[in-house]
UniProtKB/Swiss-Prot annotation:
Protein's name according to its UniProt entry: Tryptophan synthase alpha chain
Similarity annotation: Belongs to the TrpA family.
Function description: The alpha subunit is responsible for the aldol cleavage of indoleglycerol phosphate to indole and glyceraldehyde 3-phosphate.
Signal peptide: none
Recorded coiled-coil stretches: none
């Protein structure tokens, strides 16, 4: 059983959703980013998404675009991202880590080699924002071979006709993008999220996590009542950005993670 499957089985037994946190690898620098990553599980993150810094993060809003810029300026790279996962695994063998980003760096690395190297580093899943389902076959077989889950994105426009195509190669969990837009901007109405989660569940037995637009513990709790996971990224990245160069550079975002975790854990009580 994969680390992701084990984590969701554990959460199901506890009758609660996952808090899935996102940070950009190498933001604002390697050491700070590593400390933040390493501190996430103790603060309450159940699953961690680590953004692969890229020059043109088109699906991301201002907060994550700026984070990618800071990471790249500080020498961030795909190699460094894998090294961060490797370092994390020295102290944590249980928390799933998912790499999230764009296909270009993976393609340049070589799909087969990337899958093998990512698995060796301790990566559990991969989300590629700009790889259409119709083209995923050039990557998915190598991920399967390496034991890495391919996590697909579904959106408000993924209807019953489209979902089987989108979900064809899915494993690990399904990520529902709750707004038709970029990360960290507007928030979707809870009723629309409820309907979308129900629709996706008609097509798959995989857990469904909801992200884009979740900014605080109350919103995370709302989502966690219905979905199998609440994904928070821009809010954490923004708090980190506000504290760069201060003593609270790591402790402030981890305090937010702790509050988000409390919201998610109390959602179904």
């Amino acid at each position: 059983m994969s680390r992701i499957a084990k984590r969701f089985a554990k959460l199901k037994a506890e009758n609660r959703a996952a808090l899935v946190t996102f940070i950009t690898a190498g933001d604002p620098d390697h050491a700070t980013s590593q400390a933040l990553l390493d501190g996430m599980p103790a603060a309450g993150a159940d699953i961690i998404e680590l953004g692969m810094p890229f020059t043109d993060p088109m699906a991301d809003g201002p907060a994550i675009q700026l984070a990618a810029g800071r990471a790249l300026a500080a020498g961030g790279s795909l190699r460094q991202t894998l090294e961060m996962v490797e370092a994390f695994r020295k102290t944590d063998a249980e928390t799933p880590i998912i790499l999230m980003g764009y296909y270009n760096p993976v393609y340049a690395w070589g799909a087969e080699k990337f899958a093998a190297d990512a698995a060796k580093a301790g990566v559990d899943g991969l989300i590629i924002v700009d790889l259409p389902p119709e083209e995923a076959d050039e990557l998915v077989p190598f991920l399967r071979q390496a034991g890495i889950d391919f996590i697909v994105l579904t959106t408000p426009t993924s209807d019953d006709a489209r979902l089987p195509v989108v979900l064809a190669n899915a494993s690990g969990f399904v990520y529902y993008v709750s707004i038709a837009g970029i990360t960290g901007t507007a928030s979707a109405a809870q009723s629309a999220i409820d309907e979308a989660v129900a629709r996706i569940r008609r097509h798959t037995g995989l857990p469904v996590c909801v992200g884009f637009g979740i900014k605080d513990p109350a919103q995370a709790a709302e989502v966690a009542r219905v979905a199998d996971g609440a994904v928070v990224g821009s809010a954490i990245v923004s708090v980190l950005a506000d504290n760069i160069g201060k003593p609270g550079a790591v402790s402030a975002p981890l305090a937010l993670v702790k509050d988000l975790a409390a919201g998610v854990r109390g959602a179904r009580n």
